[in-house]
A protein has these predicted regions:
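Phosphate-coordination loops involved in phosphoryl transfer and adenosine-cofactor binding
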Residues: 6-8, 80, 107, 248-251, ...
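Non-heme iron-sulfur electron-transfer modules
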Residues: 38-64, 78-109, 121-159, 168-194, ...
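Short cysteine clusters
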Residues: 110-116, 120, 160, 164-167, ...
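FAD-site-proximal beta/loop scaffold in flavoenzymes
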Residues: 122, 126-148, 355-380, 462-532, ...
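A conserved FAD-binding loop/helix module that cradles the flavin
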Residues: 528-556, 656, 724-736, 867-897
Length: 901
């Protein structure tokens, strides 16, 4: 592509008028820049079936014009681009800012093979075919598109993906499950982390909180779909493994095998690093393996996730504590990632906590259970202190170990508990007794704990929002117990790494962006840096650490991690969808009991059918799901999802505005039912049904695919109508409707076609003869307005209309298909690039000409000219002629600039 920044002329818009202007100016030797907002040049003419009155093929006329424009040596075309501003004047020239949207496909590499389109998992309405059929998010707009290059529709990031702190492409794997591509879905999640099964069970699913469908019947079951993916993959006799890359000769040690450490190791190993994980516990897996109970996350699931890591060549060493990072350096490791989590339980610092037996830290209590050394709580009374996730897990685990009663005491009132509401509900359903709004005054007992002393908590945080509980010391109570379990927080093991955690700090200190510590070759990630978070957040931190380590070892700037597009607006998504079929979410059907007896997993797995149905509820908010199937399918490696919009600054001497018209939105006439009744279509949609490249193999009605036998046209829909603010005749609606009548007679010889009209206006060479020809072919014409359209149960439509020639009676008629001959409106974008009010519009909103008779094409801004339907409703021949006038004006302007005075 020409990368020049100076041109003779700018043509805004590439419809028939814009292309004509560009070609003619180019033929004169002027260098022309054409800016088109759509992915292809061609405008609206390429949508047509044939042109009137000759019934020549519209594509056969427009495609040579498109090719001549695109391949003209003096013409440069920018598609998917918008002129943001035009500044300057005719004497000094114009400075133009162009915003070029990202295509997400390298046009220089793309061969137009459409394999990306075949692989794409997201179907969206096809604008080229009037949204009567679907296309893919990765697509070429239409068969004759120029450039014949693919693009990916990405208005933004889907809320579920944007809301995932792990960085998993949630929308992507949902769309893959919907398409039956389960292994590809597993691979997509594994691009982020090896903990597919773990996250499928133990993640708190912020993606579901963000899901747009949540504002309708309820969110898509995104987390359960991830579990389905993992279960399906692990059930294979020989699941495919990630191919080991060639070693790059460098080694990294990862201290800690929790979600952050495992993810960092996984990402580094995928980049060819030799990785060793060093874990102080007797088993790898961190909190998922040692803290989360089996009824939520079975140990075998975590262990199977660990196989993903070791299959990639990562070495895991357990039962080994690291206290000297320099020793790792001496062992030949080029970098170290510290991801030791928060293994230190917080203390209450009250009487009896240290001196009485039977007072346990929740982390130790849960760890003993996971390592096969549970306490026998049969018949005992247990008090769990805390209101978070760990406290809930401890309380529910105590019930499963036979406790006669389990009391849960927390500072917060129930609504303010850190634990999720559903966790609290499930705990209460299992018989846990909640005492909210109480603090701990101390423990009582002789040698072993016998009671917990309580004091009323009046507030948990101070006025600044800091954790600083206040108590009513006079309001006391107590609970007798045999065992007390303290779950009031966790902290990092800072004592092991004094250089990374100076005195007085509670977590390891890193640069918040790069995660690099004070020791350049040491990075830290996960809860050891952030304090207690979720598994997904720790995974995201581990990914970031691996990215930064990789860049540091390659001598690159520590930047460039996860730069997603902005999240799409949910209101726009719902508006884009139009109507929604109600699709209820699946009930989790968790197996709860007042006295649970074992640690068997509670949540059932989704079946194949349920997974398809659940994924089918997705609204495809971001259109492109980032499933990466196009990346895998493209033989030219042309897909680049990292592309971003660009702004270009160019200078021109003349501007031609050829932005065309807007079609009247038929839903502004609600009495006609367009958008509600599937068998009410617009004239543009009928053009597509009649075109050689039509969406169906014949003319069918969209509602049920039947061949229509009775077809009605409603003329002047949105034209000559003060109720919608358009008193003008749209000039060519009558003629395109007559053209379609004749084509319908050819395609459906037995069809009856009736035209409900106000007046037939056929002013042009051969136009009246065209009207008479349609009448002779059998079209029925009924003079009078249509009052409204209603739909019958079978999809047929009843028109209520006046019949002026029949005495002015109000009548009704039934049709299989109704076509609204929509009119045209001015394009409001025509004046946007110019300073407010600089480009004068006429009273209807079209670009005003100084004198359309004596000075056609000239606008209120010297050096800026208008061509075609941007200045008023025009058919194709008129647009071409008017474009010629604008070209003559622009050429004269360029000549004046070339030869001053």
């Amino acid at each position: 592509m020409d990368t020049s920044t100076t041109y003779d002329a700018l043509v805004i818009g590439s419809g028939i008028g814009g292309m004509e202007a560009a070609i003619k100016l180019g033929d004169m030797g002027h260098r022309v820049l054409v800016v088109e907002k759509e992915p292809s040049i061609g405008g609206k003419m390429i949508l047509l079936s044939k042109v009137f009155p000759t019934l020549d093929c519209a594509s056969c006329i427009s495609t040579p014009k498109m090719a001549a424009t695109a391949h003209h040596p003096n013409v440069t075309v920018l598609t998917q681009s918008l002129v943001e501003s035009v500044r300057g004047d005719a004497e000094r020239g114009f400075q133009v800012t162009v915003r070029r949207a990202a295509r997400y496909v390298d046009e220089a590499l793309c061969t137009g093979c459409r394999l990306c389109e075949t692989a794409c998992t997201v179907a969206v309405p096809d604008q080229f075919n009037g949204e009567m059929v679907s296309r893919r998010a990765a697509y070429i707009p239409f068969p004759q598109a120029i450039p014949q290059k693919a693009l990916v529709e990405r208005p933004g990031t889907s809320p579920c993906t944007f809301g995932c702190p792990a960085g998993i492409k949630a929308h992507g794997y949902v769309s893959l499950v919907r398409s039956g591509k389960h292994e590809e879905a597993f691979g997509l999640v594994a691009e982020t982390t090896p903990l597919v099964g773990t996250l499928g069970r133990a993640c708190y699913a912020p993606c579901e909180t963000a899901c747009t469908r949540g504002s309708l019947e309820g969110p898509v079951s995104i987390r359960r779909l991830k579990r389905f993916i993992a279960d399906t993959h692990y059930a294979l006799p020989e699941p495919p493994t990630t191919e080991r890359p060639a070693p790059n000769g460098k080694r990294v040690a990862v201290v800690g095998s929790g979600p952050a450490g495992l993810t960092a190791a996984w990402q580094l190993a995928r980049n060819g690093y030799g990785v060793r994980i060093i874990e102080s516990a007797p088993a790898a897996g961190g909190a998922p393996r040692l803290s989360i109970p089996s009824y939520r996350l079975p140990a075998e699931v975590v262990e199977r996730d660990l196989v993903n890591v070791t299959d990639l060549g990562v070495e895991i060493v357990t039962g080994t504590r690291v206290d000297d990072l320099e020793e790792l350096r001496n062992q030949g490791f080029d970098a170290v990632v510290v991801a030791t989590g928060t293994p230190r339980p917080a203390r209450l610092h009250v009487a009896g906590e240290e001196s009485l037996s039977g007072v346990h830290a929740a982390l130790d209590f849960l760890r003993d259970i996971r390592l096969g050394q549970p306490q026998d709580l049969t018949g005992k009374v247990v008090v769990v202190i805390g209101g978070g996730n760990v406290a809930i897990d401890a309380a529910r685990s105590a019930r499963r170990l036979g406790a006669a009663a389990v009391h849960m005491v927390c500072l917060e009132r129930r609504a303010g508990m850190p634990a999720f509401g559903w966790e609290v509900d499930e705990a209460l359903s299992e018989g846990v007794l909640l005492h909210d709004g109480w603090g701990i005054a101390g423990f009582r007992g002789t040698g072993s704990v016998e009671a917990v002393e309580l004091k009323r908590c009046t507030s948990v945080v101070d006025d600044a929002g800091r954790f600083r509980p206040s108590y009513d010391e006079a309001h006391r109570d107590g609970l007798d117990c045999d065992v007390a379990i303290v779950a009031v927080g966790m902290g990092a093991d800072t004592a092991a790494f004094p250089l990374l955690a100076p005195a007085g700090t509670r977590v390891l200190q890193t640069d918040p962006t790069t995660l690099q510590t004070a020791i350049p070759w040491v990075f830290a990630a996960g809860d050891a840096v952030t304090g207690p978070t979720t598994i997904a957040q720790a995974v995201g931190h581990g990914r970031r650490a691996a990215h930064m380590v990789d860049r540091w070892l390659r001598g690159l700037e520590l930047a460039g991690f996860d730069e997603p597009l902005p999240v799409v607006d949910k209101a726009e998504v719902l508006a884009r969808q139009g109507t929604h079929s109600r699709r209820e979410p699946f009930d989790a059907a968790v197996r709860l009991a007042e006295a649970p007896k074992d640690f068997a997993e509670l949540e059932p797995a989704l079946s194949e059918t349920e997974a398809r149905q659940a994924s089918g509820r997705c609204l495809d908010c971001g259109v492109c799901s980032e499933c990466h199937q196009c990346l895998a399918a493209c033989p030219a490696d042309a897909i680049d999802l990292g592309m971003r919009p660009q702004r270009l600054e160019v200078e021109v001497s003349a501007v031609v505005v050829s932005t065309g018209y807007r079609l009247f939105p038929a839903d502004l006439k609600p009495q006609y039912g367009w958008g509600r009744f599937k068998n009410v279509i617009t004239g543009t949609q009928m053009e597509r049904l009649l075109a050689p490249t039509r969406p169906y193999n014949t003319v069918l009605r969209p509602g049920d695919g039947r061949v229509p036998e009775r077809i009605a046209y409603v003329m002047c829909t949105g034209s000559r109508d003060q109720t919608v603010g358009n008193p003008l005749c749209s000039k060519f609606c009558c003629m395109y409707s007559l053209k379609q009548n004749q084509l319908i007679m050819g395609a459906l010889p037995l069809a009856d076609v009736t035209v409900h009209y106000i007046d037939i206006r056929a002013a042009g060479k051969g136009y009246d003869e065209f009207f008479e020809q349609a009448r002779a072919m059998g079209t029925t014409f009924v003079k009078g307005r249509v009052a409204g359209i209603t739909e019958k149960e079978d999809g047929n439509l009843v028109l209520r209309y006046e019949d002026i020639d029949g005495g002015g009676v109000i009548a009704e008629a039934e049709y299989d298909l109704v076509v609204l001959a929509v009119g045209v409106q001015p394009n409001p974008e025509a004046a946007h690039p110019f300073a407010h009010g600089a480009l004068t519009l006429d009273e209807h909103g079209y670009v005003a000409e100084v004198d359309e008779d004596l000075n056609p094409g000239a606008t209120s801004i010297p050096g800026v000219f208008v061509a075609g339907a941007a200045s008023g409703a025009r058919d194709i021949p008129e647009s071409i002629l008017h474009s010629g006038a604008a070209v003559a004006q622009a050429a004269a302007q360029l000549e004046r600039r070339r030869v001053p005075g």
